[in-house]
Each structure stands twice: as structure tokens, then as C-alpha cells.
Amino acid sequence: ARAMGGWDYRFGRAMPYRGGSYGVGVMTRERILDHFTVALPRGEGAEPRVLTVVELARYVIATTHLDHVSSLAQAGQVDEINKVIEREFGGSKKPVFLGGDFNARPDSPTISKLKTDWTILTPHGASDFTHSSQAPDKCIDYILLWNGNGAKCEVVGTKIMLDFNKGDIKRASDHIPVLVDVKF
């Protein structure tokens, strides 16, 4: 964390990849109290997927990358995410945020299923594109707030990060970052 200017992180490995690992991660400037990664149900012929969860003093951040092959597999992955979050944080008063690449458009069955237990915080209208960074034409990346424990926060602002002072997003990722500014 010191080498990264005070940032800490946790990485959830989904699979080996080109001599390293492929998965999801969370970076934070706050002290991580606890963390865990769980394997999600795997769609037939698809890559392994995981949910990585980081608990901080005032809130919880979870991240995932859902299956890109099958909406049926995505439904099973959403069910598992909901089960894990309910089991671990159902009795907590901390807000639980879930972000990631859901490989699902706003009008998809997967997003409809998520909206039963989660509130989408990031822009997701007809022109709010997050993929691809080379030629954005669809919204598949979101940050959500879990409704299951009644925890509240105020959304101060949201943004799809199209402009940067430094760096080239088109070279850094095939996705455009999304941002939510919240107040507790």
C-alpha cells in the first residue's frame, strides 16, 4: 500500500492467464477490515467467474465480472451473489456496493433480476455507453447499492469517465470507468 501512495487492494483470482491471473479487484485508500472471494456458478463453455468482497469501516465493496456467453449463467451468478451478500451482510447496517462488468445491457433479463435486490447508481440510459472504450456503443458496466439491509447513502454525483487529465483509457482498458460519489 505504501508503494502505491497509501492505496491497498485485494484481488480475486478467477483463473490462470498467460503466466499470471485473471480476475477482479478492489483498490482503496481505506483500511481493509476483511475480504473474501467466492467462485460463481460457471456457464457451459464459459470462463470461471468470481465475486470479490472487501469490508471497510463504513461500507462494503463487492466486484464481479459476469459471464458473457449465457444469460442463464448470469442468472445463476446473480442468485449466488445475492445469497452471499445476504448471508454475510444481511444483519449489517453498512451500505453494500456492487460494481463491475455485468455483460448485460440495461433492458436485459440480468439487469431486471439485479434490480429486484439492488439499485443501479451509475448512469444507464439510452446513450450512457461504457463499452467498448474504442467505440462505445453499449452500457454493461454498473455500480449498484444493495437494498437488502436498509442501509442508506446519498448519491452526490455519478459519471461515465470519458475525460482524463493523464493517460489514455483506450489503451488501459476496453471499458470506460464509471464513478459514483456518495455521502453517508
Task: Please place each PLM-identified region on the residue numbering.
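Active-site beta-loop-alpha substructure in enzyme catalytic cores
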Residues: I61, V69-R87
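Structured beta-strand-rich core segments of catalytic domains in phosphoester-bond hydrolases
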Residues: A1-Y59, L66, V155-I160
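N-terminal, active-site-proximal structural segment of metallo-dependent hydrolase catalytic domains
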Residues: A1-M4, P16-G20, D79-K83, D174, ...
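Extracytoplasmic/secreted envelope proteins and their assembly/folding machinery
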Residues: A1, V24, V78, N82, ...
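Extracytoplasmic/periplasmic, Sec-exported soluble proteins
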Residues: G19, G43-A46, V69-A73, F102, ...
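Generic enzyme active-site microenvironment
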Residues: T63, L98-G99
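Metal-dependent phosphoester-hydrolase catalytic domains
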Residues: L72, E86-F97, N103-F184
